[in-house]
């Protein structure tokens, strides 16, 4: 694990001192009585206030900044994790970034063709220091997306790790965690870029064009609900 003497300080990507970040954090954590309650409030504000959009991938520090995500209102998993970490730090709650390689069984056809794999390398989450422990929080998928794709929304109570479920609400494979990386005080851009260049040829240089929300609507419409057992007579 990387040495992080102060997980509450701003960094180039986790710009927790930016006025927009400070204001967003103060607005959404205003009623929290302690760090745990404030962290939970911030989790839901980021999860549902910023729409998940993997087509918006930009692997530069300016593109990953928390303030940039607030300006755009949509982002993929890493900048959403960055935003949650920045909001926590703005509230004096220690937070850092964690990463895992996952096999994601639920994505759009356009994304699958573009990536040429169902493995998402360096999937981002936020690790928050609460009650003397580092707890994982994954604010990536907003509630509307979960409802459309029949995914159980990830809740966060500030006590237990919040990571993706292996199956969706229809019993289909959803997410498999293949490997957990280290946790970091800022985005390890060079390490992530090296992996992306190896496995996602051309994806970083030519961002994916398309409307993610529209693609999700089409995917959701094409999914047939799983058969329900017949009632006993």
Q: Which residues does each PLM region occupy?
A:
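Active-site neighborhood of thiol-dependent amide/isopeptide-bond enzymes
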Residues: 54-122
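Secondary-structure boundary elements
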Residues: 2-72
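Residue-level signal for well-ordered alpha-helical scaffold segments within enzymatic catalytic domains
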Residues: 44-45, 86, 90, 128
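His-Asp-centered catalytic microenvironments across diverse enzyme cores
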Residues: 2-3, 9, 13-16, 79, ...
């Amino acid at each position: 694990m990387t040495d992080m003497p102060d997980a509450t300080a701003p960094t180039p990507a986790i710009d927790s001192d930016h006025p927009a970040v400070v204001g967003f954090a103060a607005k959404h954590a205003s009623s929290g009585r302690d760090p745990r309650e404030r962290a939970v409030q911030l989790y839901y504000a980021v999860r549902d206030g910023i729409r998940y959009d993997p087509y918006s991938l930009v692997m530069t520090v300016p593109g990953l900044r928390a303030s940039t995500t607030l300006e755009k209102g949509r982002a993929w998993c890493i900048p959403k994790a960055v935003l949650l970490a920045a909001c926590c730090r703005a509230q004096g709650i220690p937070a850092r970034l964690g990463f895992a390689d996952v096999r994601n069984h639920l994505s759009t056809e356009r994304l699958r063709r573009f990536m040429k794999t169902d493995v998402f390398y360096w999937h981002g989450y936020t690790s928050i220091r609460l009650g003397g422990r580092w707890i994982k929080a994954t604010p990536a998928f907003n509630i509307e997306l979960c409802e459309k794709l029949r995914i159980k929304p990830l809740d966060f109570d500030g006590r237990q790790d919040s990571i993706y479920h292996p199956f969706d609400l229809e019993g289909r494979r959803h997410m498999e965690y293949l490997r957990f990386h280290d946790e970091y005080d800022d985005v390890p851009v060079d390490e992530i870029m090296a992996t992306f260049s190896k496995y996602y040829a051309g994806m970083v240089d030519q961002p994916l064009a398309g409307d993610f929300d529209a693609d999700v609507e089409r995917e959701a419409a094409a999914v047939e609900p799983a058969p329900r057992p017949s009632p006993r007579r």
